[in-house]
């Protein structure tokens, strides 16, 4: 028996790869699962546009200088700003919380207010309450209505976090490493709010050529986004080249690594529960301008309003970067991420996420939050083409 036949027979015997290609009502083919040595079974994505449960659009709060974490006197209050993290809000949330807490302690208070209940506000509140401070969150929205709930939810600490010319890489590295350390202490919690998954990158040309082209395009772009990942290469497993015949994908070049993802409904629920069970309070407020900080009784306030800070603070250093996600019905058997050209797939317990990403300039200075269904359908069709051409490993 040939090795190819032996693998498929073994998979069929266990039930992991049983079944044949299926054609759905829309005429799209879902191939049978494929077994990959040392990786388990690659279950195919049901790439169907009718599985879109919802679309979401979020405006990332990009600042050329990077996150604004600094103390300012406003309306008689000590206001510690904590916003402007671009596409790195979740990834840098714990490191930012530590930096914020250090500034809060310089004000010599025990009671602190946090404005905002998204990634940065909720995480800062949890960290401060764990460190002996009494914290109340003031917010207009809570999950699932905060912008942070619509993040793609992968570990992306350098995503549109600043420009090469203006962002401090040493400061970024400190935030990144502190966040990563905290995240590792949260692995294995009930419900898997955080988890590691295999991540596959597919390419039609050698990866070094693809990377050279991306660098050339980035250099020619009007905005030079910071690429600081080289400073923290030790945190994430490196890319592993997969030889032809060891994977089921149809492209000539495939790499595999590991990616940290956040299952946001479970993770945000855990953060809020952690905050409330330790004595935190949440109160509704709608602030229209900096003068409204005077309405808050606490004398030290952490301003974690994300993109909302652009209007609240009249801070035009915040530039919107539009990003759209397609949220699909979950496939719990899929436990890997995949990227091909400008299409990506990310697995979460609550859903599958698809996203278009041509370059860092995609969506730059675009404040529109109107969803474009055709954009997500295009991503699904591109992924459908990949999965329709899957083959069994040799």
Model segments located where?
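A conserved short coil-to-beta-strand element within the FAD-binding core of flavoproteins
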Residues: 281-295
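Flavin (FAD/FMN) cofactor-binding and adjacent substrate-gating region
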Residues: 7-9, 49, 55-76, 148-150, ...
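N-terminal secretory signal peptides and thylakoid transit peptides that target proteins
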Residues: 1-14
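Beta1/beta-strand and adjacent pyrophosphate-binding region of the FAD-binding site
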Residues: 110-118
């Amino acid at each position: 028996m040939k090795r190819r036949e032996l693998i498929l027979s073994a998979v069929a015997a266990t039930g992991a790869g049983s079944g044949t290609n299926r054609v759905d009502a829309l005429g799209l083919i879902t191939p049978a699962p494929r077994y990959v040595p040392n990786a388990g079974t690659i279950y195919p994505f049901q790439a169907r546009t009718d599985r879109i449960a919802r679309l979401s659009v979020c405006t990332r709060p990009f600042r050329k200088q990077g996150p604004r974490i600094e103390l300012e006197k406003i309306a008689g209050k000590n206001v510690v700003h904590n916003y402007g993290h671009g596409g790195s809000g979740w990834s840098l949330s714990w490191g930012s919380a530590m930096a914020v807490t250090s500034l809060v302690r310089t004000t010599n208070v025990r009671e602190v207010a946090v404005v905002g209940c998204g990634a940065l506000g909720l995480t800062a509140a949890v960290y401060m309450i764990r460190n002996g401070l009494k914290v109340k969150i003031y917010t207009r929205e809570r999950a699932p209505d905060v912008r942070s709930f619509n993040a793609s939810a992968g570990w992306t600490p350098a995503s549109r976090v600043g420009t090469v010319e203006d962002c401090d890489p040493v400061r970024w590295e400190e935030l990144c490493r502190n966040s990563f350390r905290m995240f590792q202490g949260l692995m294995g919690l009930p419900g898997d709010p955080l988890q590691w998954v295999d991540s596959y990158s597919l390419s039609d040309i050698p990866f070094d050529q693809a990377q050279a082209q991306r660098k050339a395009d980035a250099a020619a772009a009007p905005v030079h986004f910071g690429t600081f990942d080289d400073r923290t290469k030790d945190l994430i497993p490196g890319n592993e080249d997969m030889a032809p015949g060891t994977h089921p994908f149809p492209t000539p070049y495939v790499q595999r690594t590991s990616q940290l993802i956040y299952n946001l409904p479970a993770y945000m629920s855990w953060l809020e529960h952690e905050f409330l069970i330790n004595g935190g309070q949440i109160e509704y407020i709608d602030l229209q301008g900096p003068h409204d900080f005077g309405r808050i009784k606490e004398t030290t306030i952490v301003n974690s309003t994300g993109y909302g800070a652009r209007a609240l603070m009249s801070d035009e250093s915040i530039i919107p970067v539009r990003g759209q996600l397609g949220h699909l019905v979950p496939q719990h058997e899929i436990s890997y991420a995949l990227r091909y050209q400008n299409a990506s797939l990310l697995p979460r317990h609550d859903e599958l996420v698809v996203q278009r990403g041509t370059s860092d300039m995609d969506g730059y200075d675009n404040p529109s939050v109107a969803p474009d269904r055709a954009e997500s359908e295009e991503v699904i069709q591109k992924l459908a083409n990949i999965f329709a051409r899957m083959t069994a490993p040799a």
